[in-house]
Amino acid sequence: MIPVVIEQTSRGERSYDIYSRLLKDRIIMLTGPVEDNMANSIIAQLLFLDAQDNTKDIYLYVNTPGGSVSAGLAIVDTMNFIKSDVQTIVMGVAASMGTIIASSGAKGKRFMLPNAEYLIHQPMGGAGSGTQQTDMAIVAEHLLRTRNTLEKILAENSGKSVEQIHKDAERDYWMSAQETLEYGFIDEIMENSNLS
């Protein structure tokens, strides 16, 4: 059930679902697994807010276990395409593809709540048991290319070398907010609501 908020206007009461009300304040909630429908919704909201006023920041709150690489990269590409700065605020967890999205916020405007966590690891995927040998080679090549792309993005977003990212992402690498700050994926740990 999606909560509804009621506002008093000069014409009486007006009700909004909570996400529509947050959108009026340029807040987008990226929660749950990253998949195509969710990504399309996030992208549409980013484009709408940028078209409305590209001089104001957009606030993207992130709490996701990760998910589809192609859907996540579509969000990242849109964040980079629009003129509005996108502030990212991690609450709960930014794992896997979520780290790519959250760390791609505007430099100096990437935040994390004190008890949130970050996870980097290599992309998952593979060929099913009914896959032909030649298709397995194609899948393996695509997976390596995807890993290289994601490692380059993480290196650019953190200031670490691609080699360091490759080493750290070999296995699940969990980070606290403080560790994420020291690693370079965020710019500040938020102790209170100090967004401007």
UniProtKB/Swiss-Prot annotation:
Please list which residues make up the signal peptide. Answer: none
CDD domains on file: S14_ClpP_2 (cd07017)
InterPro entries associated with the record: ClpP (IPR001907), ClpP/crotonase-like_dom_sf (IPR029045), ClpP/TepA (IPR023562), ClpP_His_AS (IPR033135), ClpP_Ser_AS (IPR018215)
Q: Which one Pfam family would you cite for this protein? A: CLP_protease
Compartmental location: Cytoplasm
* Catalytic activity field: Hydrolysis of proteins to small peptides in the presence of ATP and magnesium. alpha-casein is the usual test substrate. In the absence of ATP, only oligopeptides shorter than five residues are hydrolyzed (such as succinyl-Leu-Tyr-|-NHMec, and Leu-Tyr-Leu-|-Tyr-Trp, in which cleavage of the -Tyr-|-Leu- and -Tyr-|-Trp bonds also occurs)
Q: Where is the active site?
A: S96, H121
Per the UniProt record, which EC number(s) apply here? 3.4.21.92
Give the UniProt keywords, A-Z.
Answer: Cytoplasm, Hydrolase, Protease, Serine protease
Q: Name one GO biological process term.
A: protein quality control for misfolded or incompletely synthesized proteins
EC category name: hydrolase
Which is one GO molecular function term here? ATP-dependent peptidase activity
For this record, an example GO cellular component is: cytoplasm
Give the family per the record. Belongs to the peptidase S14 family.
Outline what the protein does.
Cleaves peptides in various proteins in a process that requires ATP hydrolysis. Has a chymotrypsin-like activity. Plays a major role in the degradation of misfolded proteins.
- Subunit field text: Fourteen ClpP subunits assemble into 2 heptameric rings which stack back to back to give a disk-like structure with a central cavity, resembling the structure of eukaryotic proteasomes.
Q: What is this protein called?
A: ATP-dependent Clp protease proteolytic subunit
